[in-house]
Regions:
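Hydrophobic residues in well-ordered beta-strands that form the structural core
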Residues: 55, 95, 120-122, 250
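Predominantly a Rossmann-like dinucleotide-binding segment in NAD(P)-dependent oxidoreductases
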Residues: 126-198
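Contiguous beta-strand/loop segments that form the cofactor/metal-binding neighborhood of enzyme cores
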Residues: 1, 185-257, 286, 294-300
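Rossmann-fold dehydrogenase core element
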Residues: 108-126, 146-149
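N-terminal Rossmann-like dinucleotide-binding module
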Residues: 1-49, 329
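Active-site loop of classical SDR/Rossmann-like NAD(P)-dependent oxidoreductases
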Residues: 277-292, 308
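Beta-loop-alpha module in the N-terminal Rossmann-like domain of NAD(P)-dependent dehydrogenases
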Residues: 49-111
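C-terminal helix-rich "cap/oligomerization" subdomain common to oxidoreductases
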Residues: 1, 69-71, 296-335
């Protein structure tokens, strides 16, 4: 693909708007169509961002011959339905995280994409951020020795009332899939899939997690991760990686960082940044990095991204399932 990458945006919520804003900064890519469950919402979104076509149903977007790739921005309870619809219509897909409600749904999407030879990627923007990529290079080059611990947290306060989507089991509510996916993905970026999962949580009257603490373990690596997520507590939203020869600290906002600090015995602290990194800068939020990776992969004829591999997304979903099993959270879609 050597022409402009033509995007369709499926859903019109806040993250879809951020996506459309950031895409304006990416040369060689443009949003050409948007879809919502209502034509009114789709048209309002199209007018806001200068998008030529607006659809009041998802199927019309999936059938649009002028769309190369669809960004699925629905709540995660609809990710499987929306992404499968687009894949079945022959569209490449970038799907928001959490990838799906459970690992079974994720496996179905991955199989569908692989069977059809289509590109599919979870929108884990953290993995595409140049600062995070710089960190992983340092860790893999042995800058802090063997990783022994990872600590990360992502908590916010609403308040989120009983009618909010984050409190609705049918919509995959709770802290884990909305926020916990970040610290879990961060730990697994460095250590892969854990072989031990422990968790404890505070549950809402509706049966979703308001706050979850996780302890993940990797027997062969001799490593562990202490992770927290919450929709009732404003946590620091920091991360730290400790190895046998040093430590890396991320300031608040570790999931879209502008910098990190490397600490090693006998050395002054070293601060690392990366060109064009972080969410700030020209009003961008940081989604341009995942957008650029999708465009690069499509132009290269790749059906999976090496930065956000599908096997990695499946492994994260298995961990999230294991955490929900430990804390007793089930969704209607689990069956």
């Amino acid at each position: 693909m050597d022409r402009v990458v033509r995007w369709g945006v499926l859903a019109t919520g806040g993250i879809a708007a951020t996506f459309a804003e950031d895409l304006r900064s990416l040369p060689g890519s443009e949003v050409v169509a948007v879809a919502s469950r209502t034509e009114t919402s789709a048209r309002a979104f199209a007018e806001r961002f200068g998008i030529p076509r607006a659809y009041g149903d998802w199927a019309s977007l999936a059938a649009d011959d002028e769309v190369d790739v669809v960004y699925v921005a629905t709540p995660h309870s609809a990710h499987r339905e929306a992404a499968a619809l687009c894949l079945e219509a022959g569209k490449h897909v970038l799907c928001e995280k959490a990838f799906t409600l459970n690992a079974r749904e994720a496996e179905e999407l991955v199989k569908l994409a692989r069977d059809r030879g289509l590109f599919l990627m979870e929108a884990m923007w953290t993995y595409c951020d140049p600062v995070v990529r710089r960190m992983t290079e340092l860790v893999r080059d042995g800058a802090i020795g063997d990783v022994r611990t990872v600590q990360a947290d992502f908590g916010i306060t609403g308040p989120f009332g009983a009618g909010h989507r984050l409190r609705d089991p049918a919509l995959g509510g709770g802290a884990l899939l909305d926020l916990g996916v970040y610290p879990v993905s961060f730990a697994q970026l460095l250590l892969g899939e854990p072989d031990r999962v422990q968790a404890d949580a505070l549950l809402s009257p509706e049966g979703v997690d308001l706050h979850t603490a996780m302890l993940l373990g990797w027997s062969e690596a001799g490593a562990s991760a202490l992770l927290n997520c919450s929709i009732v507590a404003d946590t620091p939203r920091t991360a730290s990686i400790t190895g046998t020869k040093g430590r890396i600290d991320f300031p608040p906002g570790f999931f879209h960082p502008e910098r990190f600090v490397l600490h090693r015995p006998g050395h002054d602290p070293e601060e690392f940044t990366a060109e064009g990194s972080g969410a700030a800068g020209e009003g961008l939020r940081g989604l341009q990095f995942e957008q650029a990776e999708v465009a690069r992969a499509l132009r290269a004829g790749e059906t999976e991204s090496p930065l956000v591999p599908l096997d990695g997304s499946l492994a994260v979903m298995r961990t999230l399932d294991a955490v929900r099993d430990r804390i007793g959270v089930r969704y209607p879609a689990d069956g």
